[in-house]
């Protein structure tokens, strides 16, 4: 969410940014926001003048009463009553206009970083760098579900009976590999200096609207019926929420957290859930990382975070690339985002396994996360990044380390988490 003062003073910049994101339908909102802001400031000025008049009049009443000027005192009393009634009306109107303005401001997208490529959708994202040269196997790679089923590692039919499409039972060594990936990712981030955290798996609505756009909220979040609670779509939401309405000391920054959580998503959108497989599902587990830092430090942290993801994947021998998200693919709160994609030998292309985002002060502004400064408090910057989402990591592992006989090599860094198991065999 942008500062209304910034919008007022940089109207054309804000409009040009909206155009870069191909959201021209939002252009009228800029003028509407400025108009509402002018009305609110006018009402504040009027109410300030009325309060000053009321205070002055109230001080006169006692003096007039002591001087036995009853009629004059009563006239002033009547004026004070009129002022109070007027203030009630003004405050009500100001509150209504402020709510309208807030809703509009939460719809206007954040200003994107100058390095972000301009494009309409993810088809125009730009490759930045590749890590580890992909290998083409001498035999055809089956679909990931077929690999897992041959390893007796999944029961989708039972899950479908229990919960419907978009869920699974993982079994045996596949379930163990899933947990090994999570445990390794946890230790990897702890060794990078991050504090390990297990957060709430449900959050209140004001936290939801503080961390994401209305469009994201509608397409992702499950609401608990009869409660002001939502199941988290990622632990970033509850980790950032930890700092709501907080004034942070400069010497306590940056705040770096890594967390494990189950994640729940409606996947209501263009992609939807996957009928057969574990790539796009309603429930999965994930290791996430977030940073709350000084504004000037967020670009450097952004580069660190996505490189951590690359380092994690390459430590397991998985080829990956970094893909810069274009303007039209960026969610409204994001300043910049890089997707990390793993190589799929079956498809002979890369697929998304994680995403790193710098949100500037958008989340901090919505949630009231400030830093204590010598000349007043100011908003922090927040960043988030996927450490690992095991369902997609499993696909990458199974495809890249599959042998023709159906066995799968376990990356060496995972051996300690697999009880020494080095190969998964059918």
Model-predicted segments: where are they?
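TRNA-recognition modules of translation machinery and tRNA-sensing kinases, especially anticodon-binding
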Residues: 27, 130-426
């Amino acid at each position: 969410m942008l500062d209304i003062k910034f919008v007022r003073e940089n109207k054309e910049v804000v409009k040009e940014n909206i155009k870069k994101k191909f959201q021209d339908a939002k252009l009228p909102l800029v003028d509407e926001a400025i108009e509402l802001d002018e009305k609110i400031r006018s009402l504040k000025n009027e109410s300030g003048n009325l309060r000053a008049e009321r205070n002055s009049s109230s001080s006169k009443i006692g003096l007039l009463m002591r001087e036995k000027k009853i009629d004059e005192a009563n006239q002033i009393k009547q004026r004070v009553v009129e002022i109070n009634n007027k203030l009630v009306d003004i405050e009500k109107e100001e509150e209504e206009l402020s709510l309208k303005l807030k809703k509009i401001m939460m719809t206007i997208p954040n200003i994107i970083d100058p390095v972000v490529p301009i494009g309409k959708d993810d088809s125009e994202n730009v490759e930045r760098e590749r890590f580890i040269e992909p290998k083409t196997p001498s035999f055809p790679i089956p679909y990931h579900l077929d690999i897992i089923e041959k390893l007796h590692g999944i029961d989708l039919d039972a899950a479908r009976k229990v919960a419907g499409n978009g869920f699974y039972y993982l079994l045996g060594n596949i379930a163990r590999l899933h947990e090994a990936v999570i445990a390794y990712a946890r230790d990897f981030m702890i060794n990078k200096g991050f504090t390990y955290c297990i957060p709430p798996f449900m959050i209140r609505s004001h936290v939801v609207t503080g961390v994401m756009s209305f469009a994201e909220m509608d397409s992702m979040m499950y609401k608990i019926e009869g409660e002001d609670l939502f199941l988290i779509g990622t632990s970033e939401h509850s980790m950032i929420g930890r700092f709501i309405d907080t004034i942070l000391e400069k010497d306590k920054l940056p705040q770096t957290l890594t967390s494990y959580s189950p994640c729940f998503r409606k996947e209501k959108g263009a992609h939807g859930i996957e009928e057969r497989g574990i790539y796009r599902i309603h429930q999965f587990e994930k290791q996430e990382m977030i940073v709350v830092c000084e504004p000037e430090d967020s670009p450097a942290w952004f580069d660190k975070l996505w490189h951590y993801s690359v380092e994690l994947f390459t430590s397991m021998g998985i080829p990956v690339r970094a893909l810069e998200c274009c303007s039209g693919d960026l969610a409204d709160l994001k300043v910049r985002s890089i997707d990390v994609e793993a190589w799929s030998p079956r498809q002979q292309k890369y697929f998304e396994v994680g995403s790193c985002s710098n949100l500037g002060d958008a989340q901090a502004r919505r949630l009231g996360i400030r830093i204590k400064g010598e000349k007043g408090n100011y908003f922090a910057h927040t960043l988030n990044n996927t450490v690992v989402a095991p369902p997609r990591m499993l696909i990458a592992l199974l495809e890249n380390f599959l042998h023709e006989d159906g066995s799968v090599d376990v990356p060496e860094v995972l051996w300690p988490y697999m009880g020494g198991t080095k190969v998964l065999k059918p």
